[in-house]
C-alpha cells in the first residue's frame, strides 16, 4: 500500500479527487488559521516585557496576576462557546458559506477593538472585550468548517480534507508561537512590540472573508433546502463529473434517501432537530461527540497552548527568549506531525487506532514529566541563566515525545469524527453541540490552569496523565471506526455491536449491497469447488 493509497467505499473516478475540493477545503480552513493563531499567540504575548510594562504587571500579587491572565485568555473561550451555538441558527437560515462570512466579520471587529488597548486611559478592557467578539467568531467558524468540508468530501478522503482544517490550526499556531520570539529578539520593548502580534490576527480572518465569496455552498445543504438545480451544479463542479455519471447518480440517490428518511422520522424545520433529541440514538451520538472533547482537553493540550511560558518554567526553562524558543519548537513539531496525520494516518490507520496510540503514549510521557518535577523541583529555580540538569533535558524530551503522540491522534481526530457522525438533519446541531463542548472544556482549562500550577504543581501533569488513561477505555467501548463510511450510513454504523468490529461489518454490508450479483457468483463458485472436492 502506497503512502497516499485510499480505501474507497465504492469505485470512484479519479476525477473526483481534484483540485477543487482541496481548494475549497483550504480556503475554509483559513478559519482554523485564525483559531490556531489566537490560541497560540496570547500566552507568549502576555509574557512580553513590553506588555508587562504597558499594563503594569509588576504591581499585581501572584494570585491577582494569575487571575487577570486567566481572564484575558478565557473570555475568548467563553465567546467561542456561544459562537458555536449561534452557528446552528446561522447555518440553518444562511447556509454554511454565508455563515463563514458572518463569523469572519465578527472576528475582524473583535481583533480591531483589541488594538485600541493601552496602559493609560482605555486600559486592558478593549483586549478583553475584543477577545469576547473574536471568540464568538472562532466559535462559529469551528462549528461551520468541519461540517462544510465533510459535506463536500468524497468518503475516501473525508478524513484528509477535514484534516486540512486541523493543518490550518497548526499553521496559525506555528505563526502565533514564533511571532513573539521574533518581536522579542528584534524589537525594543515598546508599544509596537506587543501590538504587532495582536494586529496579525486580521490576516487569516481577512483571507477567510475574501475567500468565502469564491467557494460554493455545500451541495448537501442545498439539497436539504430544496435548491436542487443549484445543488446538482455545485456537486458536479466539485466532483468534476457530468450529471449522468454513475458516481453522481449514486451520490444523489444516497443524499435523497437520507433526507427522505429523516423527513419521515424527524421532519423539517429549525426546531425539528431539537425534537429529535428525544431519540436515544441521537442523545447518545451527542454525548459521544461532547465526551471526545472532554478527553481532548483533558490531555493538557490547551494548558500548554495558552500558558506555554508557565508550563516550560515548571520544567525548569528560564529566560523569556528561551521559553519562546522552546514554545516555537513545540509549534514546529505539531505542524510536521499534523501533515503526517493528514496525508497518511487519519484515512489509512484510522481514527480509533490513532486515539489509542496517542492516549497511551501521551499518558506515559505526562507521568514521567510529573515525576521529574516532584523529585527535582526545577520550577523553584529563579535564576535566568540556570542550567538544565540531565533530568530536565529528559523531561523536555518527554514533553516533545508527548507532542508526537498527541498531535497525530487527539489533536484533530475528534473534529473529524464529529463532522462525520451526525445525519443531515442533526448535523448542524450536533456539530454546534460538539464545538460548544470543545470550547466549554477549553474555557475550564484556560480559566483555571494558572491556579492549578500554583496549587497542584507537579500534580497537574499526573491529572492530565490520568485523564488520558481513562480516555482509552472510553474509545474502546463506545467509539466505532468511521473511516471510509459514507455519511449516509453513519446511523447503521452506530447501531452495530460490538463497537470494535462495526466498521468491518458495515463495509462488508455496503459492498454486498452494491455487488449482490458478484457476491452470489462468488458463493456459487465456492459451492462448485466444494462439490468437486467432495467428489474427489
Curated annotation (Swiss-Prot):
GO BP, one annotated term: quinate metabolic process
Glycosylation sites per record: 184
Region annotated Disordered, chain positions: 516-536
Extracellular side: 48-74, 120-131, 182-195, 307-327, 374-389, 457-458
Keywords recorded for this protein, A-Z: Glycoprotein, Membrane, Quinate metabolism, Transmembrane, Transmembrane helix, Transport
Membrane side Cytoplasmic: residue ranges: 1-26, 96-98, 153-160, 217-285, 350-352, 411-435, 480-536
SUPFAM superfamilies cross-referenced by the UniProt entry: MFS general substrate transporter
Membrane topology: Multi-pass membrane protein
InterPro entries: MFS_dom (IPR020846), MFS_sugar_transport-like (IPR005828), MFS_Sugar_Transporters (IPR050360), MFS_trans_sf (IPR036259), Sugar/inositol_transpt (IPR003663), Sugar_transporter_CS (IPR005829)
TM stretches of this protein: 27-47, 75-95, 99-119, 132-152, 161-181, 196-216, 286-306, 328-349, 353-373, 390-410, 436-456, 459-479
Main localisation: membrane
Keyword Iron set for record: no
GO cellular component annotations of the record: membrane
Molecular function as annotated in GO: carbohydrate:proton symporter activity
Compositional bias annotation for Basic and acidic residues: 516-530
Cell location: Membrane
Family of the protein in this entry: Belongs to the major facilitator superfamily. Sugar transporter (TC 2.A.1.1) family.
PANTHER family, per the entry: MAJOR FACILITATOR SUPERFAMILY (MFS) PROFILE DOMAIN-CONTAINING PROTEIN-RELATED, PLASTIDIC GLUCOSE TRANSPORTER 4
Protein name: Quinate permease
Species in which this protein is naturally found: Neurospora terricola
Amino acid at each position: 500500500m502506497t503512502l497516499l493509497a485510499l480505501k474507497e467505499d465504492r469505485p470512484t473516478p479519479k476525477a473526483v479527487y481534484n483540485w477543487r475540493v482541496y481548494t475549497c477545503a483550504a480556503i475554509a480552513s483559513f478559519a482554523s488559521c485564525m483559531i490556531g493563531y489566537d490560541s497560540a499567540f496570547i500566552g507568549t504575548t502576555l509574557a512580553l516585557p513590553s506588555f508587562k510594562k504597558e499594563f503594569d504587571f509588576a504591581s499585581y500579587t501572584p494570585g491577582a496576576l494569575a487571575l487577570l491572565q486567566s481572564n484575558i485568555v478565557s473570555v475568548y473561550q467563553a465567546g467561542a462557546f456561544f459562537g458555536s451555538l449561534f452557528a446552528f441558527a446561522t447555518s440553518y437560515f444562511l447556509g454554511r458559506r454565508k455563515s463563514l462570512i458572518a463569523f469572519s466579520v465578527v472576528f475582524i471587529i473583535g481583533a480591531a477593538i483589541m488594538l485600541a488597548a493601552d496602559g493609560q486611559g482605555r486600559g486592558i478592557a478593549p483586549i478583553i472585550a475584543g477577545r469576547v467578539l473574536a471568540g464568538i467568531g472562532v466559535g462559529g467558524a469551528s462549528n461551520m468548517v468541519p461540517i462544510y468540508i465533510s459535506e463536500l468530501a468524497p468518503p475516501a478522503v473525508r478524513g484528509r480534507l477535514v484534516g486540512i482544517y486541523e493543518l490550518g490550526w497548526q499553521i496559525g499556531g506555528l505563526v502565533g508561537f514564533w511571532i513573539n520570539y521574533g518581536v522579542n529578539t528584534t524589537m525594543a520593548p515598546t508599544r509596537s512590540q506587543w501590538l504587532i502580534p495582536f494586529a496579525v490576527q486580521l490576516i487569516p480572518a481577512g483571507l477567510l472573508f475574501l475567500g468565502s465569496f469564491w467557494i460554493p455552498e455545500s451541495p448537501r445543504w442545498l439539497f436539504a433546502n430544496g435548491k436542487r438545480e443549484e445543488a446538482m451544479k455545485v456537486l458536479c463542479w466539485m466532483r468534476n463529473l457530468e450529471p449522468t455519471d454513475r458516481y453522481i447518480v449514486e451520490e444523489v440517490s444516497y443524499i435523497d434517501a437520507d433526507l427522505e428518511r429523516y423527513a419521515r422520522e424527524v421532519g423539517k424545520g429549525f426546531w425539528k432537530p431539537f425534537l429529535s433529541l428525544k431519540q436515544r440514538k441521537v442523545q447518545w451520538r451527542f454525548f459521544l461527540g461532547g465526551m471526545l472533547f472532554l478527553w481532548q482537553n483533558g490531555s493538557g493540550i490547551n494548558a500548554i497552548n495558552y500558558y506555554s511560558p508557565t508550563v516550560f518554567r515548571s520544567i525548569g526553562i528560564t529566560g523569556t527568549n528561551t521559553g519562546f524558543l522552546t514554545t516555537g519548537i513545540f509549534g514546529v513539531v505539531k505542524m510536521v506531525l499534523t501533515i503526517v496525520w493528514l496525508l497518511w494516518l487519519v484515512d489509512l490507520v484510522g481514527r480509533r487506532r490513532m486515539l489509542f496510540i496517542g492516549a497511551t503514549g501521551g499518558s506515559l510521557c505526562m507521568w514521567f514529566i510529573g515525576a521529574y518535577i516532584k523529585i527535582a523541583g526545577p520550577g523553584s529555580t529563579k535564576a535566568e541563566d540556570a542550567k538544565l540538569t540531565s533530568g530536565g533535558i529528559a523531561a523536555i524530551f518527554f514533553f516533545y515525545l508527548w507532542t508526537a503522540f498527541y498531535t497525530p491522534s487527539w489533536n484533530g481526530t475528534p473534529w473529524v469524527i464529529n463532522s462525520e457522525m451526525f445525519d443531515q438533519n442533526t448535523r448542524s446541531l450536533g456539530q454546534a453541540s460538539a464545538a460548544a463542548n470543545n470550547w466549554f472544556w477549553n474555557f475550564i482549562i484556560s480559566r483555571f490552569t494558572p491556579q492549578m500550577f500554583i496549587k497542584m504543581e507537579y500534580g497537574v501533569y499526573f491529572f492530565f496523565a490520568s485523564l488520558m488513561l481513562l480516555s482509552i477505555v472510553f474509545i474502546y467501548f463506545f467509539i466505532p471506526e468511521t473511516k471510509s463510511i459514507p455519511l449516509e450510513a453513519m446511523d447503521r454504523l452506530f447501531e452495530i455491536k460490538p463497537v470494535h468490529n462495526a466498521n468491518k461489518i458495515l463495509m462488508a454490508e455496503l459492498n454486498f449491497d452494491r455487488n449482490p450479483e458478484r457476491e452470489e457468483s462468488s458463493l456459487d463458485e465456492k459451492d462448485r469447488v466444494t462439490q468437486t472436492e467432495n467428489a474427489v
